[in-house]
Amino acid sequence: DPMKDKDVMNVLLIGEDLRDTETDDRGNTDAMLMLSLNKKNKTITMTSFMRDAWVNIGNYGMDKLNAAYWRGGPEMLEDTLENYYGVSIDRYVIVNFKSFIEVIDTIGGIKMDVRDDEAEGMKKPMAEQNKLLNKKKGTDYLKKGGTQLQLNGNQALSYARLRYVGNADYERTERQ
């Protein structure tokens, strides 16, 4: 069974939508990605889980997958993924808006292909982010899309959060 292979370590990346980093509250998970690191073959495989998938969450019954984290933290999310999808998770990493931006900025940004409709759609989540980060309105807006655009952390987060352009949550999961 590849999901329980001793040469493979599965790391769950949890993207939390928590905006206030000064609270102990949990947000929902906007992104849930599993990185499978194969030590033998020296390969990495990434699997995305749809946040709105309807699953059984322990004693809470049926709900959207992203509610598992909100209800019981990373442990309940792990249990739900393991029970529903049959995956084995060895470790997890949680990022929120601020840490996501910091990681992308630390590596010098990320190159992405961005369509014109995506560039326009990014303005709404970026307006919220700019307010949270005490940045001037309009900061980091893209004038238009393009190929291999160098996005900073704020722009990359807005791109990853974009959900009402294209095929809704399916394209959002692809962007993440």
Predicted regions, residues:
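Non-catalytic, solvent-exposed segments at the cell envelope interface
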Residues: 1-176
